[in-house]
Amino acid sequence: MEHYFTNNQNLKSELRDINFSLNENNFTFKSDNGVFSKNKIDYASLFLVKTFLTTNKKEFNNILDIGCGYGFIGITLSKLLNKHVDMFDINKRAIHLCKMNIEINKVDATVDESNIYENVVNNYDLIITNPPIRAGKSVLMDFLKGGLARLNKDGELWFVISKDQGAKSVKKELEKICTCELIEKSKGFWVLSAKN
């Protein structure tokens, strides 16, 4: 079985459109085989975006979507917040789709290839992610701890994780090195915000 966090360029392409509306804004996302949630907007990602938009009161100027896939989180936030968003992913097909989706949705965003934070050179006010849980706990913690290391002063790391996939233990582990707050729960998913 192929994982969305790998890079199999030989996988047959079957391009498809995912149409989506939020806050009276319409979006179209190109998707394909070999990317995360290829047939529909993932519930956890949508829950993360909606929770952020309804509960966050701070203004963030530079935003990073790490492990962006075809760009749902970053593109949606860029459009609804009217902000530039940087996005990174390891999957070349996801990056190609994300570039198309930036153009289709006419947002101010960039996407580049990076194995987690390997090619990320800037620091950010907001880092937001639906991390690849299936890649294992070590990769998950690299996503989260690496994000904390790349936050500007007063910056925040927002992420979503399933209770069944260790939300409690991840929160506990992060609390050893930072403040980690549970923002919202829904259908077994937790949205958390961490800051130094």
Question: Where are these predicted regions, by residue range?
Answer:
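A short glycine-rich, Lys/Arg-flanked "PGG" loop and its adjoining helix->strand segment in the class I
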Residues: 142-153
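N-terminal auxiliary segments of SAM/dcSAM-dependent transferases
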Residues: 1-24, 34-38
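Conserved class I S-adenosyl-L-methionine
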Residues: 162-177
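Core SAM-dependent methyltransferase catalytic element
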Residues: 185-196
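Conserved SAM/SAH cofactor-binding pocket of Class I
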Residues: 44-120, 126-129
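A short linear hydrophobic-aromatic micro-motif
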Residues: 178-182
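Conserved beta-strand signature within the Rossmann-like core of class I S-adenosyl-L-methionine
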Residues: 154-162
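A short SAM/SAH-binding and catalytic strip from SAM-dependent methyltransferases
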Residues: 125-138
